[in-house]
Amino acid sequence: MATGEAIGCFGLTEADRGSDPGSMRTSAKRDGGDWGLNGSKMWITNGSASQVAVIWAQTDEGIGGFVVPTSTPGFSAPVIKHKLSLRASVTSELVMDNLRLPGDAVLPEVRGLKGPLSCLNEARFGSTWSGETRVGMPWLPH
């Protein structure tokens, strides 16, 4: 993703849970040296266009982030159609159904709410500037 060779998405929001990491139901369980992920994420920008997803899930040690290639068996990203807004980008549900990942797919040293909340805080800057730009554009000299 850093080189622009892959599109990624950020899987935190859940249906009926919003972006509240403390109430998420998506789970990741250790199975030997691997991880098993189950659950779903909702309203994910670029979900079906991504080659990589960062999925946040409850583990026995707290919330963890997982790097998931979207070609992994058990992963699907159905497109959400007929949205009322945010039509400039594709929005998807991310579904993990008995998805298996190697042990090193977990983001190292990221445990608890700090991981997903720090990402959300950074994203808020982009959202703010996007709105400010739209409001200010008519008054900028062309």
Per-range role (PLM):
Residues 77-142:
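Glycine-rich beta->alpha junctions and the first turn(s) of the following alpha-helix
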Residues 16-19, 43-46, 58, 83-90:
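Short Gly/Pro-enriched turn/cap motifs at secondary-structure boundaries
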Residues 40-77:
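A short core secondary-structure module
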Residues 4-12:
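A short, Trp-centered hydrophobic/proline-enriched beta-strand micro-motif
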Residues 4, 20-24, 69, 95, ...:
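Structural signature of FAD isoalloxazine-binding scaffolds in flavoprotein oxidoreductases
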Residues 26-28:
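A structural signal for short hydrophobic beta-strand segments in well-ordered beta-sheet cores
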